[in-house]
């Protein structure tokens, strides 16, 4: 039998396929009760797709837009001069809609500088089915959305290029089917997939899922792609022009599988749904965050995999290799999907600041060492103390190591570093032994770690900096010792100024 974590993941996928993959409807009210709308409270005679428009950020009622009924355009306040954003929810296990829908509606309608029509594709009666049937219904709902947009073109002369579909989980694939169902050469303006569903879509052909061909621009945010037995809640493969993988896309900070058993004891099987919901729905909250914190936009960087990104090797913005996650993404189209990685915080605002550090070590001890380091950073705005450094391998003779550091705060321009070899009882004993042996040597020896240069690149600003030891006469680093590094250019400039001043004083004396 597998370990507890594997068992938990397996249990999650069993629940996903049979009942609640997308964590829809937990702790919410049915649509009619939640909105308080007379129309919404009527029982449906048969499963159907309905469309609602919202007047402002506080609107919880919505107004039903009926294709082939042009009077509803005026009744619902549709403005043909503004873009149309349609939100498409995912699968439902209990026939209820999620509270995040109203949050994203409010965030979109609150942006006064960019007024838009905001609508909801309510396919809850078709989503509240067994997962496999709900998957089949995504194509039907996509065709319904396409029919709505074609009707808007005919009745209101509204261009499909002004349409932005935002689909969560199964809703992402509904968006794709809507785009591929549109007649003619022109395409929908934009589709955003929020952790598009994985089961029954992973590995399928582009016409069987959301793909870059479904709109002029397609972006996707992948937040729960952790696989077990070949399945993942969110689709793992790239399916857009820009595919973002926050924290690698596998799982998200603040969502803990290891606490699943405790949650089950407290909340029953709803705890499993909540655990899935945390990582899967993080895609939604990252998108909402991009609307609510336009001054704190998260940046993703193109990279081949999370391993390379964790080494800080991918913080380049040249040739469109970085982009903004969320609503304000730069809409560049390319022939091949771009995979972008980034780190986020566990809560909003999610933005962090990415730095690549490259450190040149010279190990004068014969054997590889695996010490623990911390680094303190002083910037023009903030100071961060004692950041733990993990190199991932032992330090050998002469090598440069690269790693990624992320900061929750904007510290401004980096002006000083403090690098410390954290002491431990084991390393203290090893070091003392080495020093004792050295004393018996015939010739003088120099032992320890030498730090010559630290190179830094700031991902968000693309600034490159080189830091040199403040004291060039003592480059060795020993256990419990801390070295100060300053900007080499500043240090060089100060030395030059000092020499010039000394020269002037010498001439003055003559």
Curated annotation (Swiss-Prot):
Its EC number is 3.1.1.3, 3.1.1.5, 3.1.1.32. It holds the Pfam family PLAT. Residues 255-278 are annotated as: Essential for determining substrate specificity. GO terms for molecular function: heparin binding; lipase activity; lysophospholipase activity; phospholipase A1 activity; triacylglycerol lipase activity. CDD domains: Pancreat_lipase_like, PLAT_LPL. Residues 1-21 form the signal peptide. Keywords: Glycoprotein, HDL, Heparin-binding, Hydrolase, Lipid degradation, Lipid metabolism, Secreted, Signal. GO terms for cellular component: extracellular space; high-density lipoprotein particle. It catalyses: a triacylglycerol + H2O = a diacylglycerol + a fatty acid + H(+); a 1-acyl-sn-glycero-3-phosphocholine + H2O = sn-glycerol 3-phosphocholine + a fatty acid + H(+); a 1,2-diacyl-sn-glycero-3-phosphocholine + H2O = a 2-acyl-sn-glycero-3-phosphocholine + a fatty acid + H(+); 1,2,3-tri-(9Z-octadecenoyl)-glycerol + H2O = di-(9Z)-octadecenoylglycerol + (9Z)-octadecenoate + H(+). SUPFAM superfamilies: alpha/beta-Hydrolases (SSF53474), Lipase/lipooxygenase domain (PLAT/LH2 domain) (SSF49723). Glycans are attached at residues 79, 398. Transmembrane segments: none annotated. Disulfide bonds: none annotated. SMART domains: LH2. One of its GO terms (biological process) is high-density lipoprotein particle remodeling. It is found in: Secreted. PROSITE patterns: LIPASE_SER, PLAT. Homodimer. Catalyzes the hydrolysis of triglycerides and phospholipids present in circulating plasma lipoproteins, including chylomicrons, intermediate density lipoproteins (IDL), low density lipoproteins (LDL) of large size and high density lipoproteins (HDL), releasing free fatty acids (FFA) and smaller lipoprotein particles. Also exhibits lysophospholipase activity. Can hydrolyze both neutral lipid and phospholipid substrates but shows a greater binding affinity for neutral lipid substrates than phospholipid substrates. Belongs to the AB hydrolase superfamily. Lipase family. This is Hepatic triacylglycerol lipase.
């Amino acid at each position: 039998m597998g370990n507890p974590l594997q068992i938990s993941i397996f249990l999650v996928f069993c629940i996903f396929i049979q009942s609640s993959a997308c964590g829809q409807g937990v702790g919410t009210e049915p649509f009619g009760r939640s909105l308080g709308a007379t129309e919404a409270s009527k029982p449906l005679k048969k499963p159907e797709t309905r469309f609602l428009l919202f007047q402002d950020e506080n609107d919880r009622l919505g107004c039903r837009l009926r294709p082939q009924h042009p009077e509803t355009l005026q009744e619902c306040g549709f403005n043909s001069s503004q873009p149309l954003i349609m939100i498409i929810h995912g699968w439902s296990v209990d026939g209820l809609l999620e509270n995040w829908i109203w949050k994203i509606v409010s965030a979109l309608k609150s942006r006064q500088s960019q007024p838009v029509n905001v609508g909801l594709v309510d396919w809850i009666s078709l989503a509240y089915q067994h997962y496999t049937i709900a998957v089949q219904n995504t194509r039907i709902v996509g065709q319904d959305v396409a029919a709505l947009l074609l009707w808007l073109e005919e009745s209101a002369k509204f261009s499909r290029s002004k349409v932005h579909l935002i689909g969560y989980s199964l809703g992402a694939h509904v968006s794709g089917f809507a785009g591929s169902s549109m007649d003619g050469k022109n395409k929908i303006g934009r589709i955003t997939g929020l952790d598009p569903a994985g089961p029954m879509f992973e590995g399928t052909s582009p016409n069987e899922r959301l793909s870059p061909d479904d709109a002029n621009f397609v972006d996707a945010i992948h937040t729960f792609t952790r696989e077990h037995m070949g399945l993942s809640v969110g689709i793992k493969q790239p399916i857009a022009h820009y595919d973002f993988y926050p924290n690698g896309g596998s799982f998200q900070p603040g969502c803990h599988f290891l606490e699943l058993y405790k949650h089950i004891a407290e909340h029953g099987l709803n705890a499993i749904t909540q655990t899935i919901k945390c990582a899967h729905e993080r895609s939604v909250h990252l998108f909402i965050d991009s609307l609510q914190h336009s001054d704190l936009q998260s940046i993703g960087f193109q990279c081949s995999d999370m391993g390379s990104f964790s080494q800080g090797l991918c913080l380049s913005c040249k040739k469109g290799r970085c982009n903004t996650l969320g609503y304000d993404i730069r809409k560049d189209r390319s022939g091949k999907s771009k995979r972008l990685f980034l780190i986020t915080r566990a809560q909003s605002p999610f933005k962090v600041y990415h730095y690549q550090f490259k450190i040149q070590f010279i190990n004068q001890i014969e054997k590889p060492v695996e010490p623990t380091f911390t680094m303190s950073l002083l910037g023009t705005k903030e100071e961060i103390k004692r950041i733990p450094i993990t190199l991932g391998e032992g330090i050998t003779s002469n090598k440069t190591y690269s790693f990624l550091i992320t900061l929750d705060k904007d510290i401004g321009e980096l002006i000083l570093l403090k690098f410390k070899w954290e002491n431990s009882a084991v390393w203290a004993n090893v070091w003392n032994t080495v020093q004792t042996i050295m004393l018996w040597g015939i010739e003088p020896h120099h032992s320890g770690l030498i730090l010559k240069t630290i190179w830094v690149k700031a991902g968000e600003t693309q600034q490159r900096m080189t830091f040199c030891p403040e004291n060039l006469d003592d480059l060795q680093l020993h256990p419990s010792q801390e070295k100060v590094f300053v900007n080499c250019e500043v240090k060089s400039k100060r030395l030059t100024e000092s020499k010039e001043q000394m020269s002037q004083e010498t001439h003055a004396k003559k």
